[in-house]
């Protein structure tokens, strides 16, 4: 049986140490490594050793019982949350570690919410019970208050095959048929055991145990019970399907695509349908354990593996018969520019950043052609420091990043029609687009109401491709436009003169001309926050959120604790954790998750500070080009409508 398990926690809760113990007890590694000794098996990258934190979601393998386990040790720092989320996508089961001293911390909430989103069955391990101040019961109360009340203690069960009376009743109370059986006939071990496995797999109950990973207390016992209580049901007889969850370029520059097989089998030299539907041939299958791998000929459903030969699949793509694409919650809200040493050609260095972009698509590496600059999206300052070091180690490039800025976006709040015509000599394309405000955080949606007598289906699809093939600049700050519904009304091509690229020009001009006529709105990223403080600190938090232009829900209380939730601009709240720690003496807790884009609270000031001039953007123009007497001429946006050929 194949099982993929993930170890997740707030930074410094003991994830990597716990993972090392699992690998050691199952003889996957011969020597226990330690984070503080810089020899942990899964923190094999130099930067992880130096910083003492997990940056990459690396995997190990071990055999236990009748199962093969694929273990993923995930980053615990918020700056590397996208890496963690991509790993969660392929987990069959998760183990959340919580320190018995610190309890639930900010990132633990993020982990829990993501596991709920992906419906991953979850176990809890309360770690560091050997430390002064450890309070297991207090942590369990926190879990019940903040996460779930369906916690079940497995520490006193299954050692000799029996289940404690408390656990017997706990299971029966959560299944009406089982409760009736219990009342009539009493406890039946096999029935309860199967029902418990089913409830765990369905994320209806959440087993827990406690121990101290560093001292090897409770880990082996937990593994034994975890193995008994977890089952998977992958089908290798079905056609092959899988998720791409990671991409890396190895030391030779070979693109390595990591896949979780969901069904079927895959062999070397097999063709596989990738993200764009094209078939690509697998040239090599690798089975990784830490930084080492062995080549194999075939994989089956439920296995984690890597392939070479695949170039068109991206992180989050389904492959084989799976045609879905993942949409991730962990989205960067900051943007930074790369600064090179004198003498370095940024365009030549771009290829290295595009490799990083393939490995981590949340970076959204962008080449600003006019400025000859590289920009990328990031979660925070720690990520920038790590990227600087990675780029030097891998590519021998010394770079620094400018101070990151908020990543703004733009949209409109009224319906308009945009017209674009592109007709230099021996070229021709015309497009009419209806542009409407879309739902907030929906992106750009495209549909066509154009008749095939006007434009072929192929050209109509081409218009849609041009709308989503890149980020388009808004008029206010040059930030990406979003939340639009764009409908192709009509268009025209020329049998002789329409060439490749003509419709791209017409589409971009039509979109821009429509924006010129619209009411444009600046958007900024918001956090959803959850803050837990004592009740006598409610007033301070309410005042701070109001000053940060946030919106707060009605506070809730739980004993002497107050729970405050709401949304607030990233720009005004990104450093609030330090302030919270200061006035609560480190006892306040806060979790922040991306809440999408909403109207900017200080749009006028931002527009003035950025100073974007819509009339001199070399990549975009709202003017159209017409042809008369063998010569092309430009017509400004406010005069172009009257000259359109389709009107």
Regions from the PLM with identified roles:
Residues 13, 29, 77-78, 101-104, ...:
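Conserved nucleotide-binding/hydrolysis micro-motifs of P-loop NTPases
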Residues 229-231, 235-336, 373:
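Conserved nucleotide-binding/hydrolysis modules and their immediate coupling elements
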Residues 329-342, 446-449, 523-533:
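Short glycine-/aliphatic-rich beta-strand segments at the starts of folded cytosolic domains
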Residues 1-13, 100-251, 272, 305:
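P-loop NTPase catalytic nucleotide-binding module
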Residues 405-469, 492-494, 515, 529-531, ...:
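C-terminal polymerase-core module
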Residues 556, 563-647:
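C-terminal accessory nucleic-acid interaction domains of nucleic acid-metabolism proteins
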Residues 288-414, 457-516, 538, 573, ...:
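C-terminal effector modules of nucleic-acid-centric enzymes and ribosome-associated factors
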Residues 1-90, 94-98, 104, 145-153, ...:
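P-loop NTPase switch module centered on the Walker A-proximal segment
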């Amino acid at each position: 049986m194949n099982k993929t398990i993930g170890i997740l926690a707030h930074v410094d809760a003991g994830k990597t140490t716990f993972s090392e113990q699992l690998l050691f007890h199952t003889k996957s590694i011969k020597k226990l490594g330690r984070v503080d000794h810089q020899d942990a098996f899964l923190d094999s990258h130099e930067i992880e050793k130096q910083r003492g934190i997990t940056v990459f979601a690396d995997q190990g393998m071990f055999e236990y019982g009748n199962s093969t386990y694929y273990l993923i040790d995930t980053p615990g720092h918020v700056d590397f949350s996208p890496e963690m989320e991509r790993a969660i996508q392929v987990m069959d089961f998760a183990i959340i570690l919580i320190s018995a001293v610190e309890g639930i911390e900010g990132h633990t909430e993020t982990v829990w919410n993501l596991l709920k989103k992906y419906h991953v069955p979850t176990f809890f391990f309360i770690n560091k019970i050997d430390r002064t101040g450890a309070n297991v019961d207090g942590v369990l109360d926190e879990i019940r208050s903040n996460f779930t009340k369906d916690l079940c203690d497995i520490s006193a069960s299954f050692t000799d095959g029996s289940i404690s009376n408390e656990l017997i009743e706990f299971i029966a109370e959560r299944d009406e048929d089982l409760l009736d059986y219990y009342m009539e006939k009493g406890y039946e071990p096999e029935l309860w055991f199967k029902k418990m496995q089913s409830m765990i797999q369905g994320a209806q109950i959440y087993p827990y145990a406690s121990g101290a990973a560093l001292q090897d207390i409770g880990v082996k016992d937990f593994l034994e019970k975890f193995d008994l209580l977890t089952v998977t049901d992958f089908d290798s007889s079905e056609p092959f399907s899988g998720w791409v969850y990671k991409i890396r370029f190895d030391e030779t520059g070979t693109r390595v695509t990591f896949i979780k097989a969901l069904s079927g089998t895959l062999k070397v030299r097999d063709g596989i349908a990738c993200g764009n539907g094209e078939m690509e041939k697998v040239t090599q299958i690798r089975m990784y354990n830490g930084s080492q791998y062995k080549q194999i000929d075939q994989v089956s459903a439920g296995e984690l593996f890597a392939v070479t030969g695949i170039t068109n699949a991206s992180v989050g793509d389904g492959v084989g018969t799976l045609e879905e694409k993942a949409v991730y919650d962990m989205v960067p809200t900051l943007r930074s520019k790369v600064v090179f040493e004198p003498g370095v050609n940024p365009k030549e260095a771009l290829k290295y950043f595009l490799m990083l972009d393939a490995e981590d698509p949340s970076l959204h590496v962008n080449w600003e052609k006019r400025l000859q600059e590289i920009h990328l999206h990031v979660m925070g300052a720690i990520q920038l420091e790590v990227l600087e070091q990675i780029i030097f180690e891998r590519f021998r490039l010394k770079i620094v990043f400018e101070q990151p800025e908020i990543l703004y976006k733009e949209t409109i709040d009224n319906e308009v029609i945009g017209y674009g015509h592109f007709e230099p000599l021996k070229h021709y394309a015309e497009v009419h687009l209806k542009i409407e405000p879309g739902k907030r955080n929906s992106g750009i949606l495209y549909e066509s109401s154009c008749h095939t007598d006007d434009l072929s289906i192929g050209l109509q699809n081409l218009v849609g491709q041009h709308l989503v093939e890149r980020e388009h600049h808004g008029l206010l700050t040059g930030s990406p436009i979003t939340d639009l519904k764009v409908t192709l009304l009509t268009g025209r091509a020329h049998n002789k003169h329409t060439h490749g690229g003509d419709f791209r020009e017409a589409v971009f001009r039509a979109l821009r001309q429509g924006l010129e006529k619209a009411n444009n709105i600046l958007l900024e990223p918001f956090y959803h926050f959850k803050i837990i403080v004592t009740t006598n600190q409610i007033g301070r938090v309410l005042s701070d959120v109001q000053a940060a232009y946030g919106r707060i829900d009605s506070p809730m209380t739980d004993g002497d604790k107050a729970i405050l939730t709401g949304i607030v601009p990233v720009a005004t709240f990104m450093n609030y954790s330090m302030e919270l720690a200061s006035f609560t003496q480190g006892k306040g807790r806060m979790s922040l998750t991306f809440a999408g884009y909403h109207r900017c609270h200080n749009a006028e000031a931002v527009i003035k500070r950025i100073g974007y001039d819509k009339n001199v953007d070399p990549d975009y123009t709202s003017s159209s080009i017409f042809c008369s007497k063998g010569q092309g001429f430009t017509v400004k946006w406010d005069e172009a409508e009257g000259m359109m050929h389709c009107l």
